[in-house]
């Protein structure tokens, strides 16, 4: 009897699970069947989308309902102003596979969401941190705009580097020497000697002709002196 009972227990049918089957998400099954091997690993193409001209009251669930049908999503992000908390009118959708992102951009570009026509482009892979968003939304200028300061700093370094290697100007060197010579006693004496003589001194020298240097250089004056001396001797 024990054996019969054990056999009856072993052959008793197990109750089946009558729970309803899980609903499958509305992915494009045809694309999944066509590329089973290529979707096993994540592709290297861009998988993030930047969605512009979104309504200000848009929520992540609104984008999920519109974009999740093209493939599994990794993230949905709607940036807001750091200080006011107001939405900025654009958002990011991150797919798991690059093929899904390309398909979503192809089909959803220029579609209407919330009464606005959206524009979709591929987004950069690196999302900004809250600190970067605070810097962008905050005061701009020397401390706020990091890109502007980093863009200007190499130009300043290049200018200073080129100035350090540039040869000194010759004009400044000669002008400095001339100024020093002008205030030196030797230069002062030369300038005095070369200055035009007063009228009385010229008449005196022309009459007496005592300067041998002027006799050698100024031949017309010497001839005049000789003629005047001869006229004086004859008159006497």
Curated annotation (Swiss-Prot):
Residue ranges, compositional bias (Basic and acidic residues): 14-43, 199-217
Keyword Cytoplasm belongs to the record: no
InterPro entries: Nucleotide-bd_a/b_plait_sf, RBD_domain_sf, RBM, RRM_dom
Region feature Disordered, mapped onto this chain: 1-53, 124-219
Gene Ontology molecular function: RNA binding
Chain segments annotated as coiled-coil in the UniProt record: none
SUPFAM superfamilies: RNA-binding domain, RBD
GO cellular component terms, semicolon-separated: nuclear speck; spliceosomal complex
Modification sites for Phosphoserine: 184
Main location: nucleus
Top-level taxon in the UniProt lineage: Eukaryota
GO biological process terms held by the UniProt record: mRNA splicing, via spliceosome
Domain RRM residues, every copy: 47-125
Keyword tags: mRNA processing, mRNA splicing, Nucleus, Phosphoprotein, RNA-binding, Spliceosome
Listed Basic residues bias regions: 149-176
Subcellular localization(s) per the UniProt record: Nucleus speckle
Function description: Involved in intron recognition and spliceosome assembly. Probably active at the 5' splice sites.
Subunit relationships: Component of the spliceosome. Interacts with RS2Z33, CYP59, CYP63 and CYP95.
Entries under PANTHER family matching the protein: TRANSFORMER-2 SEX-DETERMINING PROTEIN-RELATED
Protein's recorded name: Serine/arginine-rich SC35-like splicing factor SCL28
Species name: Arabidopsis thaliana (Mouse-ear cress)
């Amino acid at each position: 009897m024990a054996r019969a009972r054990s056999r009856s227990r072993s052959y008793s049918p197990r109750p089946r699970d009558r729970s309803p089957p899980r609903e499958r998400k509305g992915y494009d099954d045809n694309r999944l069947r066509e590329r089973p091997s290529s979707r096993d690993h994540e592709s290297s193409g861009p998988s993030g989308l930047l969605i512009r001209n979104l309504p200000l009251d848009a929520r992540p669930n609104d984008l999920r309902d519109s974009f999740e049908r093209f493939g599994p999503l990794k993230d949905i992000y709607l940036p807001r102003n750091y200080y006011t908390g107001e939405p900025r009118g654009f958002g990011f959708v991150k797919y798991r596979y690059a093929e899904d992102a390309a398909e979503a951009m192809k089909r959803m570009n220029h579609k209407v969401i919330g009464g606005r026509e959206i524009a979709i482009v591929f987004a950069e892979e690196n999302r900004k941190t809250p600190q970067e968003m605070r810097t962008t939304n905050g005061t701009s200028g020397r401390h706020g705009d990091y890109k502007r300061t980093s863009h200007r700093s190499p130009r300043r370094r290049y200018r200073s580097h080129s100035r350090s290697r540039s040869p000194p100007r010759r004009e400044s060197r000669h002008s400095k020497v001339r100024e020093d010579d002008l205030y030196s006693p030797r230069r002062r004496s030369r300038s005095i000697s070369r200055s035009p003589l007063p009228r009385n001194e010229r008449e005196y020298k022309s009459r007496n002709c005592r300067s041998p240097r002027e006799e050698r250089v100024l031949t017309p004056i010497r001839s005049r002196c000789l003629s005047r001396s001869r006229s004086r001797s004859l008159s006497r």
